[in-house]
């Protein structure tokens, strides 16, 4: 990662850094307005820009600095944040573990949700009712994973445990908060 911009309370009203992730092989692939913004930081071209708020004691970063895996060492505890694998539109049996109905004996109620509310009073469905819909594909934080190995040559961090998202997805790794 490269620090593209440093936001300060004096200029922007809050303390944060803007990070550029995954550098392009060609700087020509970056749109012109973004290229001007990146040029100030000395970054040729990046695929993603992410902004992270800073807490107290993190004020030494400035535009152009690189963040590498050397920040971590084996046996450190980290939190890994990513987007979980999407499972598309799912019904209530898969999504909310509803029991469903009889499979035979003349039943025609197999995987349906059943009743979703009363009749004339309240004449509406209450918010938060469990129904079918988009399953997964949301931000997930896996806490307290242990750093097993740090490969500074390839800038790779190896952790023990589950990492959210499909193979090849991008994740945010931070020191464990607790």
What are these regions (language model features)?
Residues 1-178:
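Extended basic (Lys/Arg/His-rich) segments that typically form rRNA-contacting surfaces
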């Amino acid at each position: 990662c490269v620090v593209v911009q440093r936001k300060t309370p004096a200029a922007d009203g809050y303390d944060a850094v803007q990070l550029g992730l995954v550098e392009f092989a060609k700087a020509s692939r970056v749109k012109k307005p973004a290229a001007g913004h990146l040029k100030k930081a000395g970054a040729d071209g990046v695929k993603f820009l992410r902004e992270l708020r800073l807490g107290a004691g993190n004020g030494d970063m400035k535009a152009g600095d690189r963040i590498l895996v050397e920040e971590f060492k084996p046996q450190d505890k980290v939190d890994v944040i990513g987007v979980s694998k999407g499972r598309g539109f799912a019904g209530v049996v898969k999504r909310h573990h509803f029991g469903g109905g009889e499979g035979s004996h003349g039943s025609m109620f197999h995987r349906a949700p059943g009743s979703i509310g009363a009749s004339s009073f309240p004449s509406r469905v209450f918010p938060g009712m469990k129904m079918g819909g988009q399953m997964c594909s949301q931000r997930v934080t896996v806490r307290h994973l242990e750093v097993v190995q740090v490969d500074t040559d390839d800038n790779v961090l190896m952790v023990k445990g589950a990492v959210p998202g499909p193979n090849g997805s991008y994740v945010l790794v931070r020191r464990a908060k607790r």
